Amino acid sequence: DAEQAKTFLHQLDLGLLLEVIDVESDDLDPLEAVAVTEDYKPLDIECATVGLALLRGIRQRYPDWRLLLDGDGGDENLKDYPIEENGELTIRSVVSNSMLYQEGWGVDAIKHSATYSGGLSRGCVRTYAPAQRFGFSGLSPFTRPSLIRIAEGIPFDALTAGSTEKLYALKGELVRRGMRARYGVDFPVFEKRRFQHGALDARAFSRRFSASVDEYRAHWLSLHVAHT
């Protein structure tokens, strides 16, 4: 992630803005993330774990900072999640279902979780809760209703023509064209990666996040049982 960020800022002639937060892998604690987010889904716990480490590092470096801005909601708005990772999804179901990644399969359907209303709210908690833990107030502009409304008007089916490759490229292309039209900037676009995947190499990542969803859930339940 540091190398990609360096490349990104260098191409925009903004390299002086780069600050790297170095964290020891032993300081990444998934069970802390379970407690803070009150969740147990592995992908969310991975993201929250790395987020906690990042925010702890920022807080140590800048004790007086209070405001955070992030990009949560962008993947949901532009349907930019790997379809191959979910056996229940097809390109057709993704482009044809309104707000699929925000609210699941519909108002009357069973959601991703009995605790959260859908994927977007779960994502908001994994950012909001760690930020609150370290005294930050966050804002995710892409989750604003006005932007979601615009995203819902995008003709995904026509633009992708049944191609997952075109769907995955769509977000970067929209951002690139928008930045060029609005600011005259050639915005660098990289292949999509999850936030947490740039924090460790693959072997260290597998060791640190080896627990199953059942193990995370058992720990989550133990925290609540201990206080009843």
Task: List each model region and its residues.
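ATP-dependent adenylate-handling active sites, centered on carboxylate activation for C-N bond formation
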Residues: D1-Y183, Q196-S210, L221-A226
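A short alpha-helix-loop-beta-strand transition element characteristic
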Residues: G184-K192
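Intrinsically disordered, low-complexity regulatory segments
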Residues: S210-Y216
